[in-house]
Design a protein with these regions (language model features):
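Buried hydrophobic packing segments
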Residues: 31, 115-122, 209, 246-249
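Short glycine/proline-enriched coil/turn segments at helix->beta-strand junctions
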Residues: 36-41, 48, 59-62, 121-129, ...
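Zn-dependent metallopeptidase/amidohydrolase metal-coordination segment
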Residues: 197-242
Length: 279
């Protein structure tokens, strides 16, 4: 593989960890080992969510934050979890792209691909916060119980939990970033990166973060496909590009704070006044 941002071995290590809702402990252990290796402050809350902090910001500055969820819906992986074994990852190349899957068990790249991208950014950036939630697939039960005080010095959140190369401009009917952000960066994003669709994501962790913190958020496509099925797979090059987009956005947004009062309009995206930005 010729990946510019993601480390191939880290990719295989993350994707091979079996994890299912309410059985995320093997991935938690992996994350804690990662934190020790890369000198990242790590904490675990009572719910089981994992919080990372790397580096220090100046007075009055804010941390960029990335997030993903640790659980998957692939119940067949319980066999591997109970035996403390790693999944067997199958890699196939087609038209210059590398497809990763786990035959018969479902890969669980929703959202281990997002976890991988967050870890990649942690390796490459000197200052960053990251949070990894449990039980997103059960109704965002982890993010609903997040330690809100931990976000007091966070300026914005980039989530990596949208399928394929789709990005979410809204979640549950509420805008994730303000209009000025899209006016400033949408053209550049379209020029520099592949964004197949902009969507109004129905339900994910950043909906609760938006509601509870008023922080601006964005949900970036994590390169996984056929999610929630045994045939789920991810494309290495698409995950790599998602990591590049994350680095680009953090460079542009910097250590500033972006707040948007949460208003859930719960309307179809096609009826939103902002929709024309994404057509």
């Amino acid at each position: 593989m010729n990946l510019s941002t993601i480390d191939e071995q880290l990719m295989l290590d993350v994707l091979s960890v079996p994890t299912v809702s309410q059985h995320e402990h093997l991935l938690v252990e992996f994350l804690m080992d990662f934190a020790k290796k890369y000198d990242v402050d790590a904490n675990l809350d009572d719910k089981g969510n994992v919080y990372f902090k790397k580096g220090m910001v100046a007075d009055g500055a804010f941390y960029p934050c990335v997030c993903a969820h640790m659980d998957t819906v692939q119940d067949k992986q319980l066999i591997w979890i109970n035996e403390n074994k790693r999944l067997e990852i199958k890699i196939e190349e087609y038209l210059g792209r590398h497809y990763l899957s786990c035959e018969g068990f479902g890969l669980g790249a929703d959202d281990k691909a997002g976890v991988l991208i967050c870890l990649t950014l942690l390796k490459r950036l000197p200052v960053l916060k990251a949070v990894f939630f449990v039980e997103e697939e059960m109704g965002c039960l982890g993010s609903e119980k997040a330690e809100l005080g931990w976000f007091k010095d966070v300026g914005y959140v980039l989530a990596f939990d949208s399928p394929g190369q789709d990005c979410s401009w809204a979640c549950g009917g509420a805008r994730l970033f303000d209009r000025q952000f899209y006016e400033n960066y949408l053209v550049e994003l379209k020029q520099k990166f592949t964004i197949k669709n902009w969507c109004n994501h129905p339900f994910t962790d950043i909906m609760f973060l938006r509601q509870d913190t008023s922080l601006a958020c964005m949900n970036i496509g994590a390169g996984y496909y056929k999610y929630h099925t045994d045939g789920e797979y991810c494309i290495a090059e698409h995950m790599d590009e998602a990591a590049q987009m994350g680095l680009y956005l953090i460079d542009k947004l910097g250590n500033n704070e972006y707040l948007i009062p949460y208003t859930s309009r719960m309307r179809d995206a096609n009826n939103e006044d902002d929709k024309y930005f994404f057509e």
